[in-house]
């Protein structure tokens, strides 16, 4: 497990969506959060599942008036991956075990599998803070702190 740094925050899929799509209701706040992170030397943790979810959602014409093409979505993901401010956090054997322990221990159902996986990956890499618009997805997991994407940035 990587050492915990107080200047890393995990991002959830809603942040990537809001930052990318002008039509997203949290677009301005996502941009404000990113500016805040950059000004405060805060690294952003990403994990594969949020990138996959981003591609799945941002290309869906039923959700957005102007969805991205698959090529555009993958280009956005590659830009995030190549940014020096970002750290890719990969699943580990320990994070997988933790995910299943949490699913059973907190009695979570099938609709919480991905959120629990995201939290477990970040936690195993020492990241216990997540920027999201879905705080309730993580609220039951002890030790995970969420920051509201729709709110103005605040000290982390």
Positions of PLM-derived features:
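Short beta-strand segments at enzyme active-site cores
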Residues: 45-48, 132
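Active-site neighborhoods of divalent-metal-dependent phosphate/nucleic-acid chemistry enzymes
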Residues: 2-4, 86-133
